[in-house]
Regions:
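A short, active-site helix/loop in glycosyltransferases that binds the activated sugar's phosphate group
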Residues: 39-74
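Acidic donor-binding loop of glycosyltransferase active sites
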Residues: 156-173, 186
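Active-site proximal beta-strand in glycosyltransferases
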Residues: 2-27, 40, 45-47
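Nucleotide-sugar-dependent
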Residues: 166-179, 190-199
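Short beta-strand->alpha-helix junction loop in the catalytic core
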Residues: 52-53, 71-89, 137-138
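Conserved donor-binding/catalytic core segment of Leloir-type glycosyltransferases
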Residues: 84, 88-110, 116-120
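A charged, aromatic-enriched C-terminal amphipathic alpha-helix characteristic of glycosyltransferases
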Residues: 224-255, 259-264
Length: 327
């Protein structure tokens, strides 16, 4: 609103939204979901983390907005998977400890209580393993460690882990914790949901605690199988989730968006060029007011783009914006 109402500019908008106040997730009394959607509807594109998350947003938005608006929102919302840097993918460690990692937030929306139940059930069968929960403040259980490290030592610790656990989550978002583990050679068993299928469809999935327990036991006991799944998971990461490839897709879209923007070559444009060339430097306020007598209702964007196509005209970044003529 500010750009449209108090400037002469009419840019194209695209954005990224990591968080939506979904009713099944937030607990506060005044969520901002509808306001967020109204802002997104002004964009040409808005990236979010997963198709699963997009589906949740569309479902909740359909309770308020009509079908035409939902169709527009569907077109705007675009999943953008958070890839990893290729150089951060390390050779898997084949001699790992019997260490299970839960490197997610230990909260209800990450089904942490159920994870602990799975662990307790396994502990009744065996006691030859430990569990690392780095985001848990502390634990009174001797077999759970909550060690915290800087980024590099955190990665080193992940390389020692036998298997990771990716829990059911209410939000349907992307799991950076899981990709952190995979790129460091730690395979994950995952709750059978579309948001994890997007991340790594080659993983082992569970929908019941009994299956999760069986899988964890298999990874603890069968090192060869564990190592095979480590390689398999990393291969999928390399082929599908490299950061620079994901960013290139976004960059290509930005280029397409810019190409769609109009510029006006007209007598007015030539007059503007002549004024800037004659004066050498003109503030935008002078150009609009003193020389053209334009009000804020006139869309200057197409003229501005035409001016900046001139090799001698530059738009300076200053407290008072200027157009400058440089030979």
């Amino acid at each position: 609103n500010v750009i449209s109402n108090v400037t002469h500019h009419s840019p194209s908008y695209f954005g990224y939204c990591h968080w939506f106040d979904l009713k099944d997730v937030v607990a506060w009394s005044l969520p901002s979901f509808n306001q967020n959607i109204l802002g997104i509807l002004e964009m040409q594109r808005c990236y979010l983390n997963t198709q699963s998350q997009k589906n949740l947003v569309l479902n909740q938005a359909s309770e308020v907005f009509n079908k035409g608006t939902i169709a527009k929102l569907d077109d705007i919302l675009t999943p953008h998977h958070l890839g990893v840097k290729e150089q951060d993918i390390v050779e898997p460690n084949k001699s790992t400890d019997k260490l299970i990692v839960f490197n997610h937030r230990p909260d209800t929306y990450k089904d942490f209580g159920n994870f602990m139940k799975v662990l307790e059930d396994i502990r009744q069968q065996r006691q030859d393993f430990t569990v690392w929960i780095p985001l848990l403040e502390k634990s009174d259980k001797s077999w759970i460690t909550t060690e915290k490290f800087n980024k590099q030592r955190y990665y080193k610790k992940l390389q020692q882990c036998r298997v990771g656990f990716s829990p059911k989550q209410v939000y349907g978002g992307w799991s950076v914790s899981t990709t952190d583990g995979i790129m460091n050679g730690c395979p994950y068993i995952m709750y059978d949901a579309d948001y994890y299928q997007e991340l790594n469809p080659t993983a082992d999935f569970f929908s019941e605690n009994s299956t999760a327990i069986n899988l964890l036991n298999k990874y603890l006991d069968d090192k060869d199988y564990r190592n095979q799944m480590s390689v398999k998971s990393q291969q999928y990461l390399k082929e599908n989730l490299i950061y620079k490839d994901e960013i290139k897709k976004m960059s290509d879209y930005i280029n397409d968006l810019i190409k769609q923007q109009k510029h006006i070559q007209s007598d007015v444009t030539e007059k503007l060029i002549s004024i800037i060339k004659l004066k050498g430097q003109v503030t935008k306020k002078e150009l609009f007011g003193s020389y053209l007598g334009w009000g804020r209702g006139i869309n200057f964007g197409p003229y501005r783009r035409a001016l900046l196509r001139n090799k001698n005209i530059y738009d300076t970044i200053d407290s008072t914006p200027h157009y400058c003529w440089i030979e």
